[in-house]
């Protein structure tokens, strides 16, 4: 008889079935199920090793080591789960103490790591505290020691740790597919809308409900084409309504009916967009933030498609709020899909372009995405007439073909973009990696490869983990057709839907990488940064081919990360001139914000990296106060020829006391008030840099905004 000596000194007879229960719990924690053959092997392995020791009493620590040995042979991931759980009581106390400390800070000080959250609100505080717990659980039960150390030191950054194991990142949601024929949401059946105003209401419900089930940006692609059929239904209704009360003998009744119907539909458009803007900027999602929603538009050329686009642009330009104090809202972010053939001089939708230009010159939005210029995004549109809208502020999907998957089956195969999503991003801190290679006298590419492989492994495990989720976790997406192939049963696992989805390798601080390499900025040189980005592309292409996973290169929009990476660099390598001597690092491949260069120079300099970040990118230039609409138009058209996704940067300011509006204002020149609302570009999206004198932004980002010259 063999006895196991437990931690408290008591004895317990050895029983292989207790091992089965313990390893099954460890497997369940990573959503794995053992086969009977694997269970039999574990029991046999453990029993043989126990009796081979020739002892009648075995300490529990030795028993744990035996079980770990069995699990390492069957499934190393379960072995890690078992190992992590062994000392969970001690670890859990430390973890909860850490969460409690952070929760007190959130409750009484607030949190400015995400400009899209208002941490003064109770619901937001609760969400932020839960996120801290979820983040600790992710680190404890998903990450290995090397990954934890790499994150702690700052060589990599795993985005959205608080939600990565619950759901997916950003998406192009197929709202049109969900609306068609009706759908079920929250156990209630929604009929397909019969009018435009109802379509707006239902679309708003869909967005608020579904955006809360993910953690990244939520895009409604080509919204003008989605809503146009419902505008037609409203139009038909209003024509019939008018004629119903018209005498047949009235001259011009039909023309009057058409005029009446068009006016009524336009009013539905205006009120619908106003409702959407109010809903998205005042009703927080269940995540505790305001849903980060983007709509793309502009390619529709029918009367109602153009009306829907122009209506949103004019509603956004005019702003929301009380009379004399109107200001533009932050959501939805608007992206204009520009095609020179229809938006150029004399084009069928030139009026839509002019409305967009007028809106951009006053509110910064819309941003502009070229469908007719150079490069990957435009080529997909020109060849297939398929639009790659940005997911959220800047993420773009790789092509996935209807029949061939990663590669077209034949010349007739077409790519699918709408309904797809990204499963998460992990970013490289390139200056840190170069500094490490130098401090250890190792080849830079050798060290870089180590972290690229680390990110690769994280993505593969994330795919496996998410694949075990059930469709019921996001029913509108997985069961009602919001995602590509999303007609599963609630009890089905979502693994079959993951193949066409992307996973991102992010890059930050390319400018600081070049500075650390030879003391020159991207403006002065940039060749080493360019070579590094090409190398990363080549390696990720190899991973993609070997793993059958759509990996993508992403120009990371560092928000709070821009300050964190400086802190991490200084801790390891100190303060280095033009690398870590400011409170922030540069975003992705952008020139440093303090560079005194023209908008055209900035467009050209950043263009070197454009096609090397096809998984996520944006180009923007800052316009001085004296810039007029004509200058903005010239630069937008130039960006469209170059194939860019272009943003207009202005520093908008509004006096909350007298209503005066002026660019770059810190004190109102009319009434002397400092009670201002200021809107600046955070990264790819806009944010309040001041609200009633306070800011939602972190100190590092505010320092960056203060130094902007050419951003």
Where are these regions (language model features)?
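Charged, amphipathic alpha-helical regulatory modules used
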Residues: 1-107, 701-706, 711
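Short, conserved micro-motifs enriched in small and acidic residues
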Residues: 13-14, 500-504
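Conformational switch/transducer regions in large eukaryotic molecular machines and scaffolds
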Residues: 15, 33, 666, 684-685
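Amphipathic, well-packed alpha-helical segments that form the structural scaffold of globular domains
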Residues: 24, 47, 456, 460, ...
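Conserved catalytic cores of very large enzyme subunits
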Residues: 92, 98-499, 520-522, 526-681, ...
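Contiguous, well-ordered alpha-helical segments that form the cores/surfaces of helical PPI scaffolds
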Residues: 503-516, 534
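Conserved helix-adjacent loop modules within structured domains
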Residues: 691-700
């Amino acid at each position: 008889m063999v006895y196991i000596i437990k931690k408290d000194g008591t004895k317990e007879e050895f029983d292989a079935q207790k091992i089965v229960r313990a390893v099954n719990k460890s497997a369940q924690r990573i959503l794995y199920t053992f086969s009977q053959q694997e269970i039999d092997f574990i029991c046999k392995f453990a029993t043989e090793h126990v009796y081979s020791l020739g002892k009648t009493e075995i300490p529990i620590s030795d028993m744990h080591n035996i079980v770990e040995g069995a699990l390492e042979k069957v499934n190393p991931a379960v072995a890690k789960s078992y190992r992590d759980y062994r000392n969970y009581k001690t670890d859990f106390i430390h973890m909860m103490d850490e969460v409690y400390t952070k929760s007190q800070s959130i409750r009484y000080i607030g949190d400015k790591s995400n400009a899209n959250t208002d941490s003064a609100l109770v619901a937001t505080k609760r969400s932020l505290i839960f996120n801290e717990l979820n983040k600790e659980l992710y680190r404890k039960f998903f990450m290995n020691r090397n990954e934890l150390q790499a994150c702690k030191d700052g060589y990599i950054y795993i985005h959205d740790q608080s939600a990565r194991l619950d759901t997916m990142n950003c998406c192009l949601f197929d709202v049109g597919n969900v609306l068609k024929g009706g759908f079920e949401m929250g156990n209630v059946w929604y009929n397909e809308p019969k009018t435009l105003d109802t379509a707006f209401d239902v679309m708003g419900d869909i967005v608020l409900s579904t955006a809360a089930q993910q953690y990244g940006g939520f895009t409604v692609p080509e919204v003008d084409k989605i809503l146009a059929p419902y505008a037609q239904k409203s139009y038909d209704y209003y024509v019939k309504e008018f004629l119903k009360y018209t005498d047949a003998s009235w001259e011009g009744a039909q023309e009057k009916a058409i005029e009446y119907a068009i006016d009524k539909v336009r009013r539905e458009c205006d009120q619908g967009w106003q409702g959407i803007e109010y809903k998205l900027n005042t009703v927080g999602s269940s995540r505790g933030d305001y849903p980060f929603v983007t709509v793309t538009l502009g390619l529709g050329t029918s009367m109602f498609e153009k009306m829907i686009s122009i209506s949103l642009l004019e509603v956004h330009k005019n702003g929301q709020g009380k009379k004399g104090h109107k200001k533009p809202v932050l959501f939805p972010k608007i992206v204009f899909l520009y095609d020179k053939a229809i938006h150029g001089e004399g084009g069928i939708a030139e009026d839509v372009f002019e409305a967009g230009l007028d809106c951009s010159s006053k509110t910064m939005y819309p941003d502009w995405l070229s469908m007719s210029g150079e490069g990957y995004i435009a080529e997909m549109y020109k060849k297939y007439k398929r639009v790659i809208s940005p997911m959220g502020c800047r993420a773009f999907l790789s092509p996935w073909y209807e029949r061939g998957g990663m590669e077209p089956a034949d010349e007739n195969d077409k790519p699918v973009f709408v309904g797809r999503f990204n499963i998460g991003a992990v970013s490289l801190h390139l200056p840190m990696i170069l500094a490490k290679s130098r401090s250890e006298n190792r080849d830079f590419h050798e060290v870089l490869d180590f972290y690229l492989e680390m990110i690769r492994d994280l993505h593969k495990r994330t795919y496996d983990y998410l694949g075990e989720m059930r469709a019921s976790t996001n029913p509108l997406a997985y069961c009602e057709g919001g995602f590509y192939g999303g007609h599963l049963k609630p009890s089905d696992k979502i693994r079959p839907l993951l193949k066409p989805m992307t996973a991102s390798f992010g890059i930050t601080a390319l400018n600081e990488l070049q500075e650390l390499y030879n003391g020159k900025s991207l403006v002065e040189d940039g060749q080493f940064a360019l070579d590094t980005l090409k190398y990363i592309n080549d390696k990720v292409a190899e991973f993609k081919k070997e793993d059958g996973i759509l990996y993508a290169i992403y120009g990371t929009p560092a928000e709070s990360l821009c300050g964190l990476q400086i802190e991490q660099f200084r801790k390891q390598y100190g303060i280095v001139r033009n690398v870590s001597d400011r409170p922030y690092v540069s975003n992705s491949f952008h020139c440093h914000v303090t560079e005194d260069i023209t908008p055209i120079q900035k467009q050209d300099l950043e263009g070197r990296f454009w096609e090397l970040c096809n998984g996520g990118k944006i180009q923007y230039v800052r316009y001085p106060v004296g810039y007029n609409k004509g200058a903005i138009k010239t630069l937008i058209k130039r960006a469209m020829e170059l194939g860019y996704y272009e943003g207009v940067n202005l520093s908008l300011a509004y006096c909350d006391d007298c209503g005066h509006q002026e660019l770059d204002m810190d004190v109102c020149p009319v009434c002397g008030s400092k009670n201002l609302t200021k809107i600046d570009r955070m990264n790819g999206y806009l944010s309040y840099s001041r609200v009633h004198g306070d800011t939602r932004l972190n100190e590092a980002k505010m320092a960056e905004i203060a130094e902007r010259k050419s951003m």
